[in-house]
Amino acid sequence: MQGGQRPHLLLLLLAVCLGAQSRNQEERLLADLMRNYDPHLRPAERDSDVVNVSLKLTLTNLISLNEREEALTTNVWIEMQWCDYRLRWDPKDYEGLWILRVPSTMVWRPDIVLENNVDGVFEVALYCNVLVSPDGCIYWLPPAIFRSSCSISVTYFPFDWQNCSLIFQSQTYSTSEINLQLSQEDGQAIEWIFIDPEAFTENGEWAIRHRPAKMLLDSVAPAEEAGHQKVVFYLLIQRKPLFYVINIIAPCVLISSVAILIYFLPAKAGGQKCTVATNVLLAQTVFLFLVAKKVPETSQAVPLISKYLTFLMVVTILIVVNSVVVLNVSLRSPHTHSMARGVRKLFLRLLPQLLRMHVRPLAPAAVQDARFRLQNGSSSGWPIMAREEGDLCLPRSELLFRQRQRNGLVQAVLEKLENGPEVRQSQEFCGSLKQASPAIQACVDACNLMARARRQQSHFDSGNEEWLLVGRVLDRVCFLAMLSLFICGTAGIFLMAHYNQVPDLPFPGDPRPYLPLPD
């Protein structure tokens, strides 16, 4: 068993010796390179030399976009490359060592920071090691979580898209000292934010449409002075509106539909209509408050969803007003309001035909004229004797006794009057009875009084029914008007969002797509 362990021990000792020798070579190389090395000095052999620094941004996660704070949070890797002539070596002198890992704090860095941060964190999250090659070129890939400012346009919220950017520049060096440029691959500048499909995490609220990158020169610097270069990485992102459609827009549309459906309640149920409409109005106010907590507090624009909720509130208020007006019309009576001929013709003849509503046909003109005379208390044309109603107020026993005597006559008279005789026939019939005995004349007076009271009550009920029919027709007209307004307003507002799309190209007038060429 000891003989079987010897080969393993020899291999282990050989690996330790080789590792120690390789480590010793790295230590020796690092010591040689760091001898008289000052990380605070720019790696330029002459003062007029410019150090080229290339940048590449790799996006691994678009964490969030806070609309109220107007802050974009991203998880990125910043790839920076530059050359330092003081870190060159010959691999032959160090047993073929081609890569040296050096702590980033020990070498010169171009001080690239995020200019438009919102939390005061300008630098990267981890100062990882840099990779140094024999020609002195340095490769540094630090990770970072940045919170950058992003101006939010709330005009089409939640069907909006935003143009956010990450602006990088050197904190201490100008264009006469370093030259910022985009990294190149196969001779082509990487003018876009690189996304590794295997490492990238999709955001649930935002979809990336364009991700170009551009070099900009600080325009605020005087002409005689050197300005600062900026590398700007743009993110054109479009919101996924499904969350807001399901949780805000769809409930609002359904609740507002309930407000429209109150027109199917009877015209006299104005109190119930106002109660339902008021509850809908309160629910819409709650949704408007929820939207106000989401968007930035700005007066530059009104969000599309706020416009829609305000529109729904206006429609609901109009429904309440309509309900009050219809209730006022439905409760009118002939004693308080006289219906004009134009109102009767419009609401009881023309509009019901147009709306295909079933309305009871109007009474003949002669009966209408008789109702008019009854309403005004006129007895001309009716053979009623000049007897006060108080003369008929006899004791109950006497009335019952007389009633039994003239039961047949009264019944015949009532049948004549209830069967709706012609006015002329009624006059002839009652005129023939005037020559009868005083008892019959008293019976005629009583019958005429009862008939007049019944006709007046019938006319009163008919007048109430007419006003109720006017209320029904007006209610139907308001229903069609509010339904049309609701449908047209909803379609018009959301069609505005349909035409708010991300442009096909990231920069207007620039035909380049700022994307890698297809293979």
From Swiss-Prot:
<feature type="transmembrane region" description="Helical">
    <location>
        <begin position="308"/>
        <end position="329"/>
    </location>
</feature>
<dbReference type="GO" id="GO:1904315">
    <property type="term" value="F:transmitter-gated monoatomic ion channel activity involved in regulation of postsynaptic membrane potential"/>
</dbReference>
<keyword id="KW-0407">Ion channel</keyword>
<feature type="topological domain" description="Extracellular">
    <location>
        <begin position="23"/>
        <end position="240"/>
    </location>
</feature>
<feature type="signal peptide">
    <location>
        <begin position="1"/>
        <end position="22"/>
    </location>
</feature>
<feature type="disulfide bond">
    <location>
        <begin position="150"/>
        <end position="164"/>
    </location>
</feature>
<dbReference type="GO" id="GO:0005892">
    <property type="term" value="C:acetylcholine-gated channel complex"/>
</dbReference>
<dbReference type="InterPro" id="IPR018000">
    <property type="entry name" value="Neurotransmitter_ion_chnl_CS"/>
</dbReference>
<dbReference type="InterPro" id="IPR038050">
    <property type="entry name" value="Neuro_actylchol_rec"/>
</dbReference>
<dbReference type="InterPro" id="IPR036734">
    <property type="entry name" value="Neur_chan_lig-bd_sf"/>
</dbReference>
<keyword id="KW-0770">Synapse</keyword>
<keyword id="KW-0472">Membrane</keyword>
<keyword id="KW-1071">Ligand-gated ion channel</keyword>
<dbReference type="InterPro" id="IPR006202">
    <property type="entry name" value="Neur_chan_lig-bd"/>
</dbReference>
<dbReference type="GO" id="GO:0004888">
    <property type="term" value="F:transmembrane signaling receptor activity"/>
</dbReference>
<feature type="transmembrane region" description="Helical">
    <location>
        <begin position="274"/>
        <end position="292"/>
    </location>
</feature>
<dbReference type="GO" id="GO:0005886">
    <property type="term" value="C:plasma membrane"/>
</dbReference>
<comment type="function">
    <text>After binding acetylcholine, the AChR responds by an extensive change in conformation that affects all subunits and leads to opening of an ion-conducting channel across the plasma membrane.</text>
</comment>
<keyword id="KW-0732">Signal</keyword>
<dbReference type="InterPro" id="IPR006201">
    <property type="entry name" value="Neur_channel"/>
</dbReference>
<keyword id="KW-0813">Transport</keyword>
<dbReference type="GO" id="GO:0022848">
    <property type="term" value="F:acetylcholine-gated monoatomic cation-selective channel activity"/>
</dbReference>
<dbReference type="GO" id="GO:0042391">
    <property type="term" value="P:regulation of membrane potential"/>
</dbReference>
<comment type="subunit">
    <text>Pentamer of two alpha chains, and one each of the beta, delta, and gamma (in immature muscle) or epsilon (in mature muscle) chains.</text>
</comment>
<feature type="glycosylation site" description="N-linked (GlcNAc...) asparagine">
    <location>
        <position position="163"/>
    </location>
</feature>
<dbReference type="InterPro" id="IPR002394">
    <property type="entry name" value="Nicotinic_acetylcholine_rcpt"/>
</dbReference>
<dbReference type="Pfam" id="PF02931">
    <property type="entry name" value="Neur_chan_LBD"/>
</dbReference>
<keyword id="KW-0812">Transmembrane</keyword>
<keyword id="KW-1015">Disulfide bond</keyword>
<feature type="topological domain" description="Cytoplasmic">
    <location>
        <begin position="330"/>
        <end position="476"/>
    </location>
</feature>
<dbReference type="InterPro" id="IPR006029">
    <property type="entry name" value="Neurotrans-gated_channel_TM"/>
</dbReference>
<dbReference type="Pfam" id="PF02932">
    <property type="entry name" value="Neur_chan_memb"/>
</dbReference>
<keyword id="KW-0628">Postsynaptic cell membrane</keyword>
<keyword id="KW-0406">Ion transport</keyword>
<dbReference type="InterPro" id="IPR036719">
    <property type="entry name" value="Neuro-gated_channel_TM_sf"/>
</dbReference>
<dbReference type="GO" id="GO:0045211">
    <property type="term" value="C:postsynaptic membrane"/>
</dbReference>
<feature type="glycosylation site" description="N-linked (GlcNAc...) asparagine">
    <location>
        <position position="52"/>
    </location>
</feature>
<protein>
    <recommendedName>
        <fullName>Acetylcholine receptor subunit gamma</fullName>
    </recommendedName>
</protein>
<keyword id="KW-1133">Transmembrane helix</keyword>
<keyword id="KW-0325">Glycoprotein</keyword>
<keyword id="KW-1003">Cell membrane</keyword>
<feature type="transmembrane region" description="Helical">
    <location>
        <begin position="477"/>
        <end position="497"/>
    </location>
</feature>
